[in-house]
A protein has these predicted regions:
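Sec-dependent N-terminal signal peptides
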Residues: 3-13
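Beta-propeller domain segments
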Residues: 77-79, 151-316, 324
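Short linear, low-complexity motifs centered on an aromatic residue
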Residues: 1-2, 82
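Short, solvent-exposed aromatic-acidic interface loops
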Residues: 95, 122-127, 185-187, 244, ...
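Acidic, Gly/Ser/Thr-rich repeat motifs that build Ca2+-stabilized beta-propeller blades
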Residues: 17-155, 204-219, 270-308, 332-351
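Residue-level detector of conserved, well-ordered beta-strand and adjacent loop positions
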Residues: 24-27, 66-67, 122-123, 184, ...
Length: 352
């Protein structure tokens, strides 16, 4: 068992004030991507290469569940996010659409530890021959499923509401279309599933247990990552806006923000490669209640944002370069301890 003890000492303004944390590796995995608690002792997780597993966080036993997903592991794609809700499983994945083309698709099934027989409830169209920018995070609010569909590296497709890539999707839990989506409220040229456009590669999506808003994180290009709110019928501006970043060639993309587009709550330039997020609520770190926790891949850090006052957002680095690239984050529903998918492992964070 690998245990790292961390003393975060208040040296710089952006480093979290002195705390003793314990980071413990629970189990080793192979390219884990998404996770969801199914009860107080078990997580269901995905591995991008195609496996769905149950991990008992007490006994540390791992079991694999057979499934029928027609997925393709291609570049950044594979089996991605997973969400347990009311004894159903929702999964976002890279669907093989033939001729080298794939889509961000969502499937649903009744939960079983023996076999998961998924049925599709959404496909992002058109399918695209690309291994980039699938997005793929899932969140449920009331009886609606929200999902992020990345722009697949196609840039300005995110400004085309007749195509799904580069948008936030909102559908009913059975895959049908809500009658109050933007399409039916003045956005007659929008596809009926689309809730918001102008997004690049959103790998964080969460419902706040406090204000009941949906929040997201998004990858910029060379700089320009951000954290913001999902807003009905609005446009975050990609690829008209660059959010402070540039193309990988160094050529500017566009302004950081301008009127007419949704403004993010917080930006990162240079990029930290934001991934999964949560709005913390729990006992273990009760002083963090209501704060956003942002995982990062490139920067290998956990960031904490205090954003109650949008004119004075405060950021702390909780830890950095301790457990590898942080892909996903879950808060235990009872005790508030924090679990990460990072590198090729599941990790636990708790107070000493």
């Amino acid at each position: 068992m690998k245990i790292i003890f961390i003393l975060l000492i208040f040296i710089f303004p952006n480093i979290a004030s002195a705390k003793n944390f314990n980071l413990e590796k629970i189990v080793d995995l192979n390219g884990p991507w998404g996770s969801s608690f199914i009860n107080n002792e078990e997580l269901i997780i995905t591995e991008k290469s195609g496996k769905i597993k149950i991990i008992n966080i007490v006994s540390k036993q791992i079991s694999e569940i057979n499934h029928n997903l027609n997925f393709l592991e291609h570049g950044q794609g594979g089996i991605l996010d997973i969400l347990f809700n009311d004894n159903f499983i929702y999964v976002s994945y890279t669907e093989n659409r033939g001729n080298g083309k794939t889509s961000t698709s969502i499937a649903k099934t009744k939960f079983s530890k023996k076999e998961l027989k998924f049925e599709n409830i959404f496909q992002a169209n058109p399918p695209i021959n690309s291994g980039y920018h699938f997005g793929s995070r899932l969140a449920i609010k009331d009886d609606y499923l929200f999902a992020s569909a990345g722009e697949r590296g196609e840039g300005m497709i995110a400004q085309d509401p007749t195509k799904h890539p580069g948008s936030i999707i909102r559908i009913n839990l059975d895959g049908s279309i809500p009658k109050d989506n933007p399409r039916f409220k003045g956005k007659s040229n929008w596809l009926p599933e689309i809730y918001q456009i102008g997004i690049r590669n959103p790998q964080g999506l969460v419902l706040s247990p406090f204000d009941r808003k949906i929040y997201m994180s998004n990858h910029g290009a060379r700089g320009g990552d951000w954290f913001g709110e999902v807003k009905e019928g609005e446009n975050y501006g990609w690829k008209i806006l660059g959010w402070g970043g540039t193309n990988y060639s160094g050529i500017p993309i566009g302004p950081k923000w301008k009127p007419g587009f949704t403004k993010a709550i917080h930006y990162w330039v240079p990029s930290i490669a934001t991934s999964a997020i949560t709005i913390y609520k729990g006992k273990e770190f009760s002083e963090w209640n209501g704060h956003a926790l942002i995982t990062s891949l490139k920067d290998q850090s956990l960031r904490k944002l205090i954003f109650k006052d949008l004119s004075n957002v405060k950021e702390d680095i909780v830890f950095q370069k301790k457990i590898g690239r942080l892909r996903d984050i879950q808060v235990h529903p009872e005790n508030g301890k924090i679990y990460f998918l990072a590198g090729d492992s599941l990790w636990l964070m708790e107070k000493n």
